[in-house]
Regions:
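Ligand-binding loop in jelly-roll beta-barrel domains
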Residues: 79-81, 89-94, 103, 113, ...
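Transition-metal
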Residues: 1-138, 198-225, 250, 332-338
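Loop-centered beta-sheet repeat module
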Residues: 147-194
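Compact, glycine/acidic-enriched structural inserts
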Residues: 127, 135-148, 153
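C-terminal amphipathic alpha-helical segment
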Residues: 194-266
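His/acidic/aromatic-lined binding-pocket segments of jelly-roll/cupin-type domains
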Residues: 86, 95, 117-120, 158-159, ...
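Short beta-strand segments in beta-sandwich/barrel cores
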Residues: 260-261, 277-282
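Short acidic-glycine-tyrosine-enriched beta hairpin
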Residues: 156-168, 284-311
């Protein structure tokens, strides 16, 4: 049972979804919160039947609960379209050099959202690296020549990677994750990727994977930026914002003790992603309800949950036997929606 801001009652709860595993030629992905068609998350911690039954899809929950799920401004802006996708990427080998279109181009070509994303590196092997952005200015003509002769990586900025590193990848930024990295990815609800260079390797079906070099040419931002990595200073028991953009805000929590989160101010659903350790996320205790009615979920490393807007008064309770618990908190800052 969740209590709304003005003691409004609804039967929503903190939600966990069944992970969706996807095998890739370079490793694997695990989609933990998704409303992408053909890959939609379904409820894992629901009831045996009813509106919150196990197996109910995320899009169906959004349609049923509307603003109580998404928040009022999100509901007015997105309607029944859940705006974010959360996945874990486990790269054993290098991913393709790629880029994603912005909203305007994606809507024009594919009838969907664009794809802006961010990465939080959870594990990185010795010598781990990734590509993000250009290190020198090139023209669309030079781009085509370098894709053709296989030298495109020579003009990309290569970053050495360590655990805890954060990279913001706006639509239009050329990029690639390389082998030996496991990361959490938060992005817009979109599965549109323009593959530019794929090391001349076959896919899992033995056939060469399709490239989208012409589509990518118009989607790429050729600007050279002074930095591509996000710097931040984490604090104990005090959330720190690490990404803020029109599509999502991400904060990191490093917690050693329970603390209370009043999330109503966001007017948004909130996603929690466990990066390390484990913790309980539970309804904040209220006099109005007995303790037995408090909704609780447990997250371990690599798990996530969604806190609907109607359940936005919670406690984060770490398992101190496991040391420091590290969480990402994700929501949509919808003040710009008016």
């Amino acid at each position: 049972m969740c209590v709304g801001k003005n003691t409004y009652l609804c039967n929503m709860k903190i939600l966990k979804f069944t992970p969706i595993y996807k095998k890739k030629v370079w490793g694997s992905e695990t989609w933990v919160v998704s409303a992408v068609p053909e890959s939609t998350s379904v409820l894992e911690n629901g009831e045996t039947d009813g509106e919150l039954a196990n197996g109910v899809s995320l899009p169906e929950l959004v349609r049923r609960y509307g603003a109580d799920f998404l928040g009022r401004k999100n509901w007015e802006h997105f309607g029944a379209e859940f705006p974010l996708l959360v996945k874990f990427i486990d790269a054993h080998d290098d991913l393709s050099i790629q880029v994603h279109p912005n909203d305007e181009l994606a809507q024009e070509r594919h009838g969907c959202m664009g794809k802006t994303e961010m990465w939080f590196v959870m594990d990185a092997g010795p010598g781990a690296r990734l590509y993000s952005g250009f290190k020198e200015r090139i023209s669309p003509y030079e781009y085509e020549k370098r894709v053709e002769d296989g030298s495109i990586t020579d003009v990309l900025q290569c970053h050495s990677v360590n655990r805890g590193d954060v990279f913001f990848i706006p639509a239009g930024r050329i990029h690639a994750i390389c082998g030996g990295i496991r990361l959490a990815e938060i992005q817009q609800t979109s599965d549109v990727t323009y593959r530019i260079f794929d090391y001349n390797r076959p896919g899992l079906d033995g056939k060469m994977r399709e490239l989208h070099t012409e589509l990518a040419k118009d989607a790429i931002d050729y600007t050279v930026y002074p930095t591509y990595q996000t710097d931040y200073l984490s604090k104990i028991n005090n959330p720190v914002a690490i990404t803020h953009c029109p599509y999502f805000t991400v904060k990191i929590h490093n917690i050693t003790r329970p603390y209370h989160r009043k999330l109503y101010k966001y007017d948004s659903f909130v996603i929690y992603i466990c990066l390390n350790g484990d913790c309980m996320i539970r309804e904040h205790r209220r006099r109005l309800f007995p303790k037995s009615n408090m909704d609780t979920v447990t997250l371990t490393k690599g798990e996530s949950c969604v806190v609907p807007m109607a359940c936005a008064d919670i406690d984060l309770v770490p398992n101190n036997d496991r040391g420091l618990t590290e969480l990402l908190e994700v929501y949509v800052d919808n003040k710009k929606f008016g």
